[in-house]
Amino acid sequence: MQAATADSISVSNKSQNELIPFSQFLESLKEKMKQVFHVRADIDQLSLKRGLPPFVMREIMSVNPLSVGIPTQYGGRGGVMKENLGLLATASYESLALSLTFGINSALFLQPFGKFGQDEVKAPVFNRFLNDKAMGGLMITEPDYGSDALNMQTSYTESGSKYHLKGKKHWAGLTGWADFWLLSARQQSKSEKLQRDIDFFLCDVTAPGQNIVVEEFFENLGLYAIPYGRNHIDVQLPQTHKLVPETTGVKMMLDLLHRSRMQFPGMGMGFIQRMLDEALTHCKERMVGGKSLFQYDRVQHRLSKLQASYTICSAMCANSSEKAGLDVDLSSQGMEANAVKSVITDLMQEAAQSVVQLVGAKAYKLNHIAGRGTTDSRPFQIFEGSNDILYAQISEGLVKMMKRAKERNLFQFLKGYDLTDKAVHFVKSQVDFNLDLQIPQRKLVEMGKIIGRVISLNQVLDLSEKGFNKELIDGSVAFLQQEITKLMSAFNFKNEEKVVDGYDENTSWMNFVAG
């Protein structure tokens, strides 16, 4: 990768990739997905095996979907957030795994690399994405440091003109597939202690001294199309491969992760719409007791919840399009990013479970979109921050802000908070009380769920002001009011029960039955 070639590559890409309207761009992608998933092959059968046949990715990548994450000066579409979300939504209607593949490439590689990478290496990297259909990913998680990522043990030392990285990474999506990686590591001092800050480096696995050894491929429960595994890191990287943070490496990581979390609704959008469409079709066609399922009140309730999830996700996509651009520093926006990611992934899993319940036994198969959807959507509640942890962090952030504002009444605080100022009036009776700011951890999670849904309601009301379908808005408002009421009831119920040591003493039920 020589800096001297950067300008010529950039100009070449720009001339070759004149931007077509985004709607036309998406239609090209839809046509390719139709060909590979429904004409040349059957996605329900493809989903039974790990990976994807080469022709599938070859055809899909031929329309350069990843160009949405590449700056215009390098031949891409400019990294526009609305387009990134639109791409994810279009792909997830057909395949959640394909959408996540796009999301990994864009949100976890192209966007942070474009923002923090050194200029002299950008052109050749972006050129390989556009012309050679390269892929990229991110490695943060380690076998002993998942949620505790700040204490990662992957280290680096500087020697001459190179950085030497050593360590283990696992559960990075596209393990063994990606050509490029962003690797996270902590600098090792001369005393062999690791610095507190975290740095990120570009790694080109095709270059000498930069190969990453895959020690094991995992048998992941869902998302069969995406390889995961455990990686051994021992690479020598040029100084130009170090990403340059605006302040600290930790803040760079938070900006990266918060922007990624704000893009989860893109993956949720097409997925939830597909679940809704499948449910509507099945319920209108399936006859039970002389009438269609669609006519049963309980079924209507389930379908209305799916429509509410569709509306909430739409609101989140509109919100992220306006707030999560690459020009914005999101490192301090954890409250909103955590709420968006955790709530939408809960709704994704609930949507899949609901459709399986409606369809019945036929959906309990990997080659059924809803059955597959339950296992494919489940890890979204775990990766990039387990939802329980994110909900707890939301509450911790809330408590800090309330202490700073010297306000103990939850309603009064939320009324003056920009993420909740509209929604709080719809749930005043539920949140108008003085909050004990010494909240036990189990209650932190419950309160985080409540605040996450109040924030979601605020985004729905913002979407309403833009002219979105009023009936769907009203349905989602009612759904969120019910959810918040239910969660508040759980929060108010006092339960301090703990695990009983020696639970198996005098507990065999057979001893308490005669005969």
Summary of predicted features, one role per range:
Residues K168-I212:
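A short core secondary-structure module
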Residues K115-P143, Y156-Y163:
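FAD-binding glycine-rich core of flavoenzymes that anchor FAD
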Residues M1-I104, Q111, F116-N131, S429-I455, ...:
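Amphipathic, small/basic residue-rich leader segments at the start of a protein or domain
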Residues S95-Q111, F129-Y145, K168-L182, E219, ...:
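FAD-binding core of FAD-dependent oxidoreductases
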Residues G270-Q273, D277, H301-T311, N338, ...:
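Generic structural signal for well-ordered, non-transmembrane alpha-helical segments
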Residues Q2-A3, D7, A361-Q430, L437-P440, ...:
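Glycine-rich phosphate/cofactor-binding loops in nucleotide/flavin-utilizing enzymes
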